[in-house]
């Protein structure tokens, strides 16, 4: 921030007047996955919502409030759902042990895991199996986001809004685009995520 102030002494005064971020980031609470640092964004460039395992749950009023504000007030053009390899929430959902109150939160992932269990268990390498389910969870959350009434209404109104699924490698610092992007109602119907039964 010292460098920023040396280049623009009024940076924070300008920043305090308004925010016009072009994107909403929905990511994991993991302290090693900070949105701004991962994408090289400055303060004011990203609206952020984080929770364990980057979940989009239709009864989560916190997430829905963030989504509504970012889409309808800030008019973001992109929403990125970014999970990460090695996600503890996803790993807990794949197991049988109780981890406390979080069991209620990861129930949604656990249900998805049961649905895909046969396919997942065909992957013999444990790390590859875990990584694949992390990716599937992100795709599920992208679909969950795309079918919210907030996003559906924005598209119906002709608002430019794209939803993307990314995964971050803790051990590499690299982001992988999972090639799941929705821009319209038709994108949902035509997507392999929807056809795989992630709905």
Question: Where are the model-predicted features located?
Answer:
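Short beta-strand segments
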Residues: 26-28, 50, 80-84, 164-169
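Glycine/charged-rich beta-loop-alpha catalytic/anionic-binding loops adjacent to active sites
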Residues: 43-54
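N-terminal short beta-loop-beta anion/metal-coordinating cradle
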Residues: 4-45
């Amino acid at each position: 921030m010292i460098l920023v102030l040396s280049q623009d002494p009024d940076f924070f005064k300008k920043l305090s007047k308004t925010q016009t971020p072009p994107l909403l980031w929905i990511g994991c609470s993991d302290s090693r996955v900070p949105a701004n640092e991962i994408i090289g964004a400055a303060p004011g460039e990203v609206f952020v919502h984080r929770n364990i395992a980057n979940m989009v749950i239709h009864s989560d009023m916190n997430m829905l409030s963030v989504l509504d504000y970012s889409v309808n007030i800030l008019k973001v053009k992109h929403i990125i759902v970014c999970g990460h390899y090695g996600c503890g929430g996803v790993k807990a959902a794949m197991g049988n042990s109780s981890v406390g109150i979080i069991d209620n939160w990861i129930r949604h992932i656990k249900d998805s895991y049961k649905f895909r269990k046969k396919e997942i268990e065909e992957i013999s390498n444990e790390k590859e199996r875990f990584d694949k389910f992390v990716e599937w969870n992100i795709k599920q959350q992208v679909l969950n986001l795309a079918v919210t009434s907030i996003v559906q209404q924005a598209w119906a109104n002709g608002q430019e809004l794209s939803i993307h699924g990314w995964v971050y490698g803790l051990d590499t610092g690299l982001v992988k685009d999972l090639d799941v992007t929705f821009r319209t109602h038709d994108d949902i119907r035509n997507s392999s995520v929807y056809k795989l039964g992630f709905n």
